[in-house]
């Protein structure tokens, strides 16, 4: 009900809001467009002028926007999550960094308010998500170029739409692209309670794959275990339990994993490698422990294990926009079927961004922070 009320309010206010980022963003027309066809209006945005601690460098500012023209699309943002990649980008520790000052946020969903005369694929009322990282979604509205956006169906839940473009896409590609897995095969992963981890569990279940899910021990471990099993997890283990000899009993009931998904690094990634089948692949897509991946010589030689990396932004560079759109539609179908849900989310109004940023950086917080506009 809260989401519904906010979205309704956003739509009611939308006609009063008009289009484009103020003059100091004019150098960024590759993703945003600017026009002086109407009187400027003010919108709110979370802006950082230098890299550092997000709690210190991110500020809520009023920015001037003007009307759309040509291939521009005026978007009213509805909701946008805070992801680890957003935090890393603000800190300056990411593979893609926008010019400063910049608006935070790589993911989110918005509704089209108006389009320029040469826009062909979008119309007012459509829901859209960013086509690439670095768009700056933590704002009430903006005007972007048509090519910077992808239209999505409006018949999926708002939280699912807001969290669609990064984590589920990463999960799907890793499950499909690195090993030719068949129904009944198994996958092992760490950081299983993360947004990607929860998507891996659900997509793997839809593909009839078994999952062994590793998490850090915590006071509410039973609650977390039950929640992951409700999503479709076959086994949930703490990192300590994975090291115990009793873990071998798991592999009496299912084949050794041919695919491991690593978001942690350090000792956790070494344990994943130990449990891989000969010839298996470990894909690293994050490094939460800030420690290097360590693979013993014996594992590489005698088990012929493969170490790979995955970054969704690089995948997009190597594939056409149509292929990304096809991926999005595949995931939307899973959402419609009830086989893929949004991660556990906590909605926070944009003005409460400091609380949301702090919560997103705390350990053992499984709820994703969603900024609502």
From Swiss-Prot:
Its EC number is 1.3.1.104. Keywords: Acetylation, Fatty acid biosynthesis, Fatty acid metabolism, Lipid biosynthesis, Lipid metabolism, Mitochondrion, NADP, Oxidoreductase, Transit peptide. GO terms for cellular component: cytosol; membrane; mitochondrion; nucleus. It is an enzyme of class 1 (oxidoreductase). Coiled coil: none annotated. Residues 1-53 form a transit peptide. The modification N6-acetyllysine is found at residues 61, 252, 267. The active site is at residue 94. Disruption phenotype: Homozygous deficiency causes placental insufficiency and embryonic lethality between 9.5 and 11.5 dpc. Expressed in Purkinje cells (at protein level). One of its GO terms (biological process) is intracellular iron ion homeostasis. It is found in: Mitochondrion. GO terms for molecular function: enoyl-[acyl-carrier-protein] reductase (NADPH) activity; nuclear receptor binding. The modification N6-succinyllysine is found at residues 61, 252, 267, 316. NADP(+) binds at residues 167, 193-196, 216-218, 285-288, 310-312, 368. PANTHER family: ENOYL-[ACYL-CARRIER-PROTEIN] REDUCTASE, MITOCHONDRIAL (PTHR43981:SF9). Catalyzes the NADPH-dependent reduction of trans-2-enoyl thioesters in mitochondrial fatty acid synthesis (fatty acid synthesis type II). Fatty acid chain elongation in mitochondria uses acyl carrier protein (ACP) as an acyl group carrier, but the enzyme accepts both ACP and CoA thioesters as substrates in vitro. Displays a preference for medium-chain over short- and long-chain substrates. May provide the octanoyl chain used for lipoic acid biosynthesis, regulating protein lipoylation and mitochondrial respiratory activity particularly in Purkinje cells. This is Enoyl-[acyl-carrier-protein] reductase, mitochondrial. It comes from Mus musculus (Mouse).
